[in-house]
Amino acid sequence: MAARRRRRRKNKNGTLFFCIVVEIIAVLALIGILRWPYSQADRISQKRKPVVQELHISRINISHEVQKQAQSHIIIGEIGGEEIIYPASMTKIMTAIVAIEELSDLEQEITLTSDMFAGLYERDATQAGFQPDETVRAIDLLYGVMLPSGAECCIALADSIAGSEEGFVELMNQKAEKLGMDGTHFCDTTGLHDPDHYSTAKDIAILLKYAIRNDTFREIIESPYHSTPGTNIHPDGITFYSSMFNHLPDPTVTGGKILGGKTGFTNDAGLCLASYAEIDGTEYILVTAGAFSAGTPHIDDAVTIYNRLGEAALALHDE
């Protein structure tokens, strides 16, 4: 584990790369260090000629990236995709999908207790705005998990479903194992830093691909905002805003649009983003992690990469 963490720290600087597109199958590579898995190369016939030779992308901020077609298992490019990362709040994708699958009634009411907030203020955890003794619907907690990244919503769902956060984390790790997320281990539902709470960009891509097959999850993650009904504490309800769409007022990219995503940040993880977009009728998943620059480099990088994919897709139609 220590060796994997040391390997992870080597890649905090921005990375210059280009992409080659062959019939919408793009291969992203580090300049001078080709990362083209043999299994991927075998899928691409030597007789096919690339219609776009090189699409140079300016220096980006990520140190780990995986991009794949959402409808298939084909990875079209990666930078450090199997290296250990701290997933931060991308963890909440797993929290949400496990909760959705475990809940028998999304309209059931759950009361948040003061114990559920223990340690959240001290660790400066992001919260959705619910209060102790507030009774809310499970569906509103799910929106609170995915849009504003509310830690109290994660704990409330975990307690209600499994009796404790620890019990719920067992379900998360079981799901990770079932999905083949071999480089992942969860310690909590929130993504707050723990050295033993880790994943890989490739594993998060596997997770997001699985989660967006669920209609409820998809509706939640694609929502720019959500307003709850009134509660005993907030009679006018609460309106949540997506932490991704907040920084992405126009999700349009060349040839399509970014449909949804989950951001993450801790001091150790850097800025992270797991997102997906539809470009020229094909859905793509992009997971980036390890951006330590100021501003919103995780979102800027996603827009840049999706735009390049769109340009490549449009170039195919001009042939």
Predicted feature locations:
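Intrinsic disorder/low-complexity segments enriched in polar/small residues
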Residues: 11-13, 24, 55, 70
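Hydrophobic membrane-insertion alpha-helices, especially the h-region
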Residues: 18-33
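Hydrophobic alpha-helical segments, especially transmembrane helices
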Residues: 24, 93, 277-279
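Active-site-adjacent loops and short helices of periplasmic peptidoglycan-processing enzymes
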Residues: 36-202, 211-212
